[in-house]
Amino acid sequence: MHHRMNEMNLSPVGMEQLTSSSVSNALPVSGSHLGLAASPTHSAIPAPGLPVAIPNLGPSLSSLPSALSLMLPMGIGDRGVMCGLPERNYTLPPPPYPHLESSYFRTILPGILSYLADRPPPQYIHPNSINVDGNTALSITNNASALDPYQSNGNVGLEPGIVSIDSRSVNTHGAQSLHPSDGHEVALDTAITMENVSRVTSPISTDGMAEELTMDGVAGEHSQIPNGSRSHEPLSVDSVSNNLAADAVGHGGVIPMHGNGLELPVVMETDHIASRVNGMSDSALSDSIHTVAMSTNSVSVALSTSHNLASLESVSLHEVGLSLEPVAVSSITQEVAMGTGHVDVSSDSLSFVPPSLQMEDSNSNKENMATLFTIWCTLCDRAYPSDCPEHGPVTFVPDTPIESRARLSLPKQLVLRQSIVGAEVGVWTGETIPVRTCFGPLIGQQSHSMEVAEWTDKAVNHIWKIYHNGVLEFCIITADENECNWMMFVRKARNREEQNLVAYPHDGKIFFCTSQDIPPENELLFYYSRDYAQQIGVPEHPDVHLCNCGKECNSYTEFKAHLTSHIHNHLPTQGHSGSHGPSHSKERKWKCSMCPQAFISPSKLHVHFMGHMGMKPHKCDFCSKAFSDPSNLRTHLKIHTGQKNYRCTLCDKSFTQKAHLESHMVIHTGEKNLKCDYCDKLFMRRQDLKQHVLIHTQERQIKCPKCDKLFLRTNHLKKHLNSHEGKRDYVCEKCTKAYLTKYHLTRHLKTCKGPTSSSSAPEEEEEDDSEEEDLADSVGTEDCRINSAVYSADESLSAHK
């Protein structure tokens, strides 16, 4: 193959022509240009594609402030060779330049498209220095942080660059091994340096010559030659005519490309130079500069805008496992097409996997820049991923903290301090607060899906239940300071002495009202009003839990544990078993110390004790009734749902409870199988038996002042007095009959069919009288008018009649 040496004209104003002297008896080194010295006119390009020549950089090459460093990919592994484009100057802004995260082809393509559109090329930004040094083993380490793409001083130029490819030979076919025919081993040594430049020169020939992108190499010794004693030969760029034979490509390794001159303003960025070979520094590059020993054989890499890759074959360096693939850039799709050649992998070689490169858009490029560089130094006028290495970290001034809504809404008469009840924050008075001073309403997050069972800890006032007509409507949650006002910090009193606020609901809101004059330096402590405490099922007073034995408990857990000590685990006496049978005496062995009732389990006894203490935590959602036993609540809910699963087999009546059905069946059978444990009397209904047992067990008796009847409860006596006074407040709307209690009126309405005749009126009145007697828990005696038998209860007398 014929080679023609051309001089490389990098001639900005006041710059001499570049030459390089030989080292170790080597030929002088000179660069070639891309055509004529004059700048080309913007004419149409007849042929799609134009090669770019890569000149050799001589050993005496000094700093060039107006030369452009061009890195072309040497394969799929982001390695390349530098070249200079002479005679075409484009002014670049002074350094430093912001770093752009983009691919190599992303930056070279706009220059090509700008020329095709008859527009001046855009300005490009170049890294400061990229050093890649390699040996036969190609020990590459990914150290992107060590590559500083900026130049701190104002000297912009091309530092001494090296393109050294030692001991290499190219055979006639690109896919064959590139080692010499004499059989000795091939060593590859490469060193590349990139520098920022301020001007670009690119004269292109117009005489119809086809330019080649050519790299020539020869075989050398296996051992690495020292930098000072290395032999050098020129690296030349050949130009061939348009009618170059096709076999010249195969034998010479040169890829011809036809067409007029094409400007290639090129940008090289560090994101595709992620690999760096250790062992060579900038000082080493300045001290020892060596070139390449080349032969007539050549390795060619072509770059074109639209090139047929079918005629290109991959060139493989088998000794180091590096494959040079033909690369084409499409100006239409803006995609990079890689060759389909494979990479030769050996045990002692570095393998490069062909990537599929995709052009990035401008938006993603900006996002990458924002992710990588977060700190902007105004003195350096550039961005850094962390603190500036020269000026250090910047000074940040934080915003003034904004307090929460709860703290900002605190009245000026109050302050926030440590609470005395154990909470973190409490509300204290700064001045005297008079009695009947109201605060509110309480502001918080409303929740309509809050279940009753979820509020298990009654001591924590983070959830406030709001009822409407006895039904839970919603809850106010006071857990977030940004959603609540200052009232969320008011704590609950532990006893009556601490309480100075009363919390009560009004119109779906919670208000606090002072119950006494509160002097300064006192904490606001609330407790619920009587009605609200009944609604939510808590004690009406915040006193400590006091047992009948005199023991004071500060918490319900302590009180519950104390009640266990009162449980007497003993069997009832044989005389008290009576007709209940042995099964009852064995099952009900847990007796209450406050009443004669016994239970089959200690848990039932605990629930029973809660009834003695007035604690009813289980509240009905449909009405205001509360229960100490959850089973009673479940039974009560059947009243609202109308569920009656127990039906009488002898009539059409149905009942919500099994016990009610059993009591009803006695009416049909007439059996008296319930016997008193203290006497021999028998009863049909369990309710009658309980009423009778009170005669033997209850000591306190209330006597009617108008008659000799005795009563166990005051409310029963009041109802009895109404019978003496003739007060019947419950009137039937159908027949105008009146009754003492609502219960009797309800029972009458089930059978009332309207106004009754006069003959049946006395009978109905007699029934009413007997019903009135049922209300009295009397322990007195009644004489039968038929005989002299004496009965202790009215119902027993009625049954006797």
From Swiss-Prot:
Enzyme category, top tier: transferase
Database matches in PROSITE patterns: SET (PS50280), ZINC_FINGER_C2H2_1 (PS00028), ZINC_FINGER_C2H2_2 (PS50157)
Chain segments carrying region Disordered: 751-782
InterPro entries: PRDM4 (IPR017124), PRDM4_PR/SET (IPR044404), PRDM4_Znf (IPR041493), SET_dom (IPR001214), SET_dom_sf (IPR046341), Zinc_finger (IPR050331), Znf_C2H2_sf (IPR036236), Znf_C2H2_type (IPR013087)
GO MF terms held by the record: DNA binding; DNA-binding transcription factor activity, RNA polymerase II-specific; histone methyltransferase binding; methyltransferase activity; zinc ion binding
ZnF endpoints (C2H2-type): 545-566, 618-640, 646-668, 674-696, 702-724, 730-752
E.C. numbers: 2.1.1.-
Annotated keywords: DNA-binding, Metal-binding, Methyltransferase, Nucleus, Repeat, S-adenosyl-L-methionine, Transcription, Transcription regulation, Transferase, Zinc, Zinc-finger
Domain of life according to the entry: Eukaryota
Compartments it resides in: Nucleus
Keyword Transmembrane: no
GO cellular component, one term: nucleus
Function comment: May function as a transcription factor involved in cell differentiation.
Family under the similarity heading: Belongs to the class V-like SAM-binding methyltransferase superfamily.
Name of the protein in question: PR domain zinc finger protein 4
Protein's organism: Pongo abelii
Organism taxonomic ancestry: Eukaryota, Metazoa, Chordata, Craniata, Vertebrata
